[in-house]
Amino acid sequence: MSERYRGSLFGLAIGDALGTTLEFKSPGTFTPLTDMIGGGPFGLAVGQWTDDMSMALCLAESLIKCQGFDAKDQIERYVRCWRDGHLSSTGTCFDIGNAVRGALLNFQRTRDPYSGSIDPNTAGKVAEIPIFES
């Protein structure tokens, strides 16, 4: 794994762990953070990340194992994350968006990795693809 790839994952994890404290809060409704403090709506410990990072790690793991993009392998890892807490900072899936849940349920029913819905937070979950390919 390249240093750039590893660095992108560390950056995502740090940003996600920092941001979880303020998750679901509107701008201007909180005092800006100057340190990582944990807490937030999920009561996470300092340094723990959310489902967004868990999914990014699933994608990174799939890209490395498959030596490129494999939609079925990727979504199977997302299902493991959702059902078993795979790559979760807590060992369980404590949050998942409705669009993601719907896509995973569709996949379990159809076995078609492209049968899901569109998640508006997708961009934050695919940063590993261009870095992996570079």
Explain the meaning of each model-derived region:
Residues 1-134:
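Structured, active/binding-site neighborhoods that engage oxygen-rich ligands
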